[in-house]
Amino acid sequence: MSILNGPRLNFWGGIRTDVSLPNNSPTIPMGTGGSQTLNLFDLPNSQVAAEAASYSDDQLNELINAPNGDYYTAGGWNHYGQHVVDMQNVLISSQGTPGAISTTGDLVGQPVYLLGSKDPVTNQPPVSGPMMVDLDPTSGITTQIYIGGLQIGGTSNPQLVIQADVVASSFDVAKRLLVGETDAPGSSPLSGTFQVTFPLSAVVSWNQNSAMLKSIIQAPGATGIVVRFVMFEMCPGMTTPQLDADYAAGQYTPNPSIGRVVGTLAPAFAGEPLICPVGRQLVNGKTGGTGYAEVVALKGQNLLSLDMLNLIPKATFRAVRTDITSPIGPNIDYGPVSISAGGTTLVTLPSSNPYLLDYYLYGGILDQALNATQLTQVNGSPLSLSAPNTVAGTKLAVSEMTYRLYCDQRNLYMDEYPEGVTLDLQVRYLGGPVPAAGSITLAASSPGSYEDSEYWDLLDYPATFAIAKGQTSVQIPISCKAGTTAQAGYTNLEYSLEDGSSFSNFRIYSITDFGIPAGSVPTWDQVYPAVLRFHYLAFPAMSRFIPLNQQDAIWNARAAIVARTADAYRGTTLYMPVVRSMSPSQRALLKSYLTSTPWQP
């Protein structure tokens, strides 16, 4: 089962992501009207760029925070974020089984929270929330959210508590609104889909009197609990004038991105993807918005369950910038929506249908009954959605990608795989095995701003990989190229077959001695520029806990820093730094300094 074919809890509300922005670009504008550019950061190596090294920390902070005309500051719209993700008044809005979803029930109205990690060493409960991390900070397709659990219900009467360290990665980043917010990043019209699967063993407590929770947790054959949520209509809370005034007054207030979230919780089963939606893939040809479909056999009835949350766009951004908890409002009304298989219309839904009009109450999921003839058509033909009206120069034209490729290995840090990694790539045709032998094509490129090949051409992989008729998966070996240990960068590896494609991202850290002789005890003057200066400038919120530019403060906190940069914390929201920007060589150098032990690169 999954969010499409199992019992569901649907929820919606607001969400905030408090990320820090200066590391999103290696350069910043400077001079009158941004007429010049300064190479500020060497992001693959997490260091201040050579061109900026002679500037003082205060000078660089002033340049980062300088107004940048009508678009925030030279360093972007948030310099002081802690990377925390938190839900805002997210409530369960409907529950039930496919074909029988209701806006009333024992859990409707209960709040939903994502949690941070409990301490893996001391077992202390979470003290912070989930953390948003970009594998490549210059990219829009490498976002991750490190999560430590989930809770339904308030602290005084929790209905469900889950504790497990999982990572959600962004999928299906595409246009969700025809028009975004004007005073905002270019991502404001976009949406991103995130999914995690918690094992059943991670359930700490639950209300066993809840029939709905019982149907999920005790679903026959269930192995876990899956949560899929979509973030959209996101923009910084403050406008450009507000942020510039705040910085000018010396307040340096965090300016998180705020927006909408719609999601679904359901039982997970063996063989289903853990971090991406299950089912056949449909794509809106105009916006790139992606949906999923699956045939459900339930209580003697066949249903076509459609995740349509991203398939029909919304016309405009919300009217009130900071209002992220009021009703989201309808998508574009293209007229009656026809769902078809091949050339045959299965059903035409009026635009007043509640699953179209109030889609966010139902997780964006629609269940449509099928008769025997329709079931045969759906199983053997591509699906599509269409509607008659043209709105703002756009029409609704959604088609199924007959081939779908997907993988639970989305964002990988290659230092964790010194011998290489094998991608377990799932391949489907109309939801089933491939009908004929074929050849999967693989191609590497840059996922972000670092387009020179020295920063992304770092992997060994087969250019093509055969798949036989009847197969549903292949295992593809990936490793770092020989002779690249001194290089650092980011690689996007796309895999495609016929009309289907997807990708995985990789971060490769350099192995270096920083020019420090082996056997010597590192000094502050060596460690600060090699390890800490970049983090002090790019992530000043860290210094609100430990001032990263103060030798005494770092030394006094040495035990905590050594602990939190250790591998025991790596998969948690408590890892330092939370953005995973410190290479193994940097961590080793920092530890050598903090423990006064000879440097062994």
Where on the chain are the PLM-derived regions?
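Aromatic- and Gly/Pro-enriched helix-to-coil junctions and flexible linker segments
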Residues: 1-601
